[in-house]
A protein has these predicted regions:
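Soluble acyl-CoA-dependent acyltransferase catalytic core bearing the H(X)4D motif
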Residues: 1-7, 24-39, 44-283
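Long, Pro/Ser/Thr-rich low-complexity/intrinsically disordered regulatory tracts in eukaryotic proteins
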Residues: 6-7, 11, 16-17, 22
């Protein structure tokens, strides 16, 4: 059993039927140089072989009885690969737009909290001997960087072994969860003096910053944006759209402007949203 961090608990609490807290990672792979056939069956076989070294994939949320403690991770949960590994077909003609529509549908459904919080989709039907792998992983299981690393490890097909996860699944007993919760509460009590001290220091810091903001009212305006067609009430459905930027050109421009690649891509995206908003307002 493993303790969830405070941030993880916040992410769980902030999830609603309309606001999902999973992240998507997408890899489009050209399989023309592969030895053998890059099939769903092969993908499933490789994934199963890698599971022993993909530790977070075995984590499952367990609620503490009567909510006496925050949820905890059970670290050796049983996996139903028929649920976690899905096969999807990209409709003809199998281009980027069609793949985007499939990704949007995948993003629109929340992960099942009664199972380990991840799924991978193997998308077939793309043009040019390509396949796509779409990973859906909850933020409490892995952040964006960790999710990308997990995705990369699942795509290393060439050196996969036949190692299987050992041990039989045995769900945690209630008394074990309660014992863990009690020990953790005792450990938290020991840190109470420092927590109170940090809280007092933080309160004074917030008060000081509030006074500073009063002398710069223009800063507060940035956190109160005007209403647009985008920032309204959400529904569960998601629409996904992608664009292609030449990496060499992006690197050259970012070097010329002495900014990071992230700075440049975010600026391009913000500019595109501004243009789109203007078009919608005008129509």
């Amino acid at each position: 059993v493993k303790r969830l961090s405070g941030w993880d608990v916040f992410m769980l609490a902030s999830e609603t039927p309309n606001v999902h807290q999973h992240t998507l990672k997408v890899a489009v792979v050209d399989t023309s140089g592969f030895e053998g056939v890059a099939s769903f069956e092969r993908f499933r076989e490789v994934f199963r072989a890698r599971l022993p070294v993909l530790e977070p994939m075995h984590y499952q949320l367990v609620r503490t009885p009567w909510h006496l403690h925050r949820p905890v991770w059970y670290e050796d949960a049983e996996l139903d690969l028929d649920y976690h590994l899905q096969r999807v077909e990209v409709p003809a003609p199998g281009g980027r737009r069609e793949l985007d529509a499939v990704i949007g549908r995948i993003a629109s459904t929340p992960l099942d909290r009664s199972r380990p919080l991840w799924q991978f989709y193997f998308a077939e039907g793309l043009t040019g001997q390509r396949i796509a792998v779409i990973g859906k992983i909850h933020h409490v299981l892995a952040d964006g960087v960790a999710s990308a690393n997990l995705m990369a490890r699942t795509l290393q097909w060439s050196d996969a072994t036949d190692e299987q996860a050992g041990g039989a699944f045995a769900p945690p007993r209630v008394r074990d969860v309660m014992r863990f919760a009690a020990h953790d509460h005792v450990a938290r009590v020991r840190t109470l003096p420092s927590a109170v001290r940090d809280g007092v220091v933080g309160a004074f810091r917030l008060q000081r910053r509030a006074r500073q903001r009063l002398s710069h009212p223009d800063l507060a305006d940035r956190f109160d944006p005007p209403p647009t067609f985008l920032n309204h009430k959400l529904s569960p459905g998601r629409t996904f759209a992608s664009a292609v930027l030449p990496l060499a050109q992006v690197k050259a421009v970012s070097k010329k402007l002495e900014v990071t690649i992230n700075d440049l891509v975010l600026t391009v995206a913000a500019g595109a949203l501004s243009v789109l908003h203007g078009q919608v307002v005008n129509t």
